[in-house]
């Protein structure tokens, strides 16, 4: 192999840390050389009697570090008595020092004020550039490990879903009831979604891993080689400069100085790299690809599932991926244009300026990360489109914005509560549809576009401007109504959307009536940190305004201030416990069919409505419940439990 074309990536593979340690040794070695010139400056004042001891001192230092500087701390093959070219040159410099016993103050000043400072600057530059490369490697490795961990989590989640599906199947085989059949269907849909997630994450990881080991890591290793050669090249220049000063001041030593310079000239930067690389080369193979592993109890294949509700997840994922791909390609074009201006100063040249090298390292690091991201997205998009074609055609996709909710809010998809600054959620900017972050990719593409689910002033903090990271809170006067309907996990997002909309309209048109004013007492100190949540002290008495509806919160009035407080932090008196306890039959059902009330005692319902049951057996096959604040009776066989 020619030294002119020698590259670390030809012989080193997954050895970044070994190379980084070697580069660090070289950078720290510059400190030794800097100290050498400072000490020589003082020794020059004492003439020849000090020069011999100085040469011996640094000869010993060189001997102790010879192996680490030549072949690294943990070489694959011992170098024996061999030393790298730089150390050989350094040895000849020390030999010359022994023979040079006379000098004067000017030489001492030149060594102290010129050479030592250049070495200090070179060391700081090398260390700064090494840290940049080290940070890039950590980012790339972290991203790879993150993808691998996501595959492992998806695999565990998929296998658990298979277990749940098998359990649901066994229950259905045993009972053959409508409820068990519905649970079986939901479990199967959940398992298939998690299978797709597992497969896609695995494919993305494999592609990312290939790019990491075949392109990203070799590129970093080659740049580390260039960095070391940059150090050696600049070190050679400093050494030459130091002896040029000595030559100009000591004509009698001119011939010896020329000889040393010729030896330094033989120290080609690539020689150290080649010696290090050849003594650290070892057998290495690319890690094997991951393959789909089906659950032991669920026989399956590695094919993506595009049937039924799985389409929602794949459709949303495809649209998100294509949008992200466009952004990443735009970013890549921008980075290419920035790099074009730096390529005049060749980034692979050992003589490249520090500022240019640092800028090009940062930009090329970003470029590698963007290319890796583009590769990941293209793998995912190609896989989905090859199996399901253009799923996104004809869909009315929500334009979600990620938010945090200060007060409890109901997810319009799964009907569970979204709450807390750490609980991430999404709000559609077009229709106000709210959901968990985890539900975003499961929401059907049926945006109402201009028909908001809730009034914007009540749903989102309007003081927040164009940002994806803001807090949202409900501002309804009846705070706990915003999360009353949270007892359904039905997957029909259209029905969920309509029900949520009807609930909000009821809240806007029907003022909340406070509960009977019955006193209670606060059991523990509580500090309210969010809007609508009050602060209370142990022993304070209060008036109950709204009871706990199952959310874990009550609305109370203390010393003229009303707000929410955890139900577990208060104690109600016996009269209140009796008055606010729900009927034993209280639960929720979903309407299977529409029914129009025939009298004032009956309740009109629509398919998909969620009804709170107050009496399951009202007589003659009828039940009693509450819908949109209205209480009435409805046919018991028109509904099903949720």
Swiss-Prot record:
Gene Ontology annotations of biological process type: Arp2/3 complex-mediated actin nucleation; clathrin-dependent endocytosis; regulation of actin filament polymerization
A Pfam cross-reference name: FCH
Plastid is among the record's keywords: no
Annotated SH3 domain residues: 515-575, 584-642
Annotated F-BAR domain residues: 6-272
Protein family: Belongs to the BZZ1 family.
Designated gene of the protein: bzz1
Family matches, as PANTHER family: FCH AND DOUBLE SH3 DOMAINS PROTEIN (PTHR15735), PROTEIN NERVOUS WRECK (PTHR15735:SF21)
Annotated compartments: Cell tip; Cytoplasm, Cytoskeleton, Actin patch
InterPro entries, alphabetized: AH/BAR_dom_sf, Bzz1_SH3_1, C1-like_sf, DAG/PE-bd, F_BAR, FCH_dom, PE/DAG-bd, SH3-like_dom_sf
Protein name listed in UniProt: Protein BZZ1
Function: Plays a role in endocytosis and trafficking to the vacuole. Functions with type I myosins to restore polarity of the actin cytoskeleton after NaCl stress.
Phorbol-ester/DAG-type Zn finger ranges: 397-447
CC annotations in GO: actin cortical patch; cell division site; cell tip
Coiled coil residues, start to end: 113-190
SMART domains associated with the record: C1, FCH, SH3
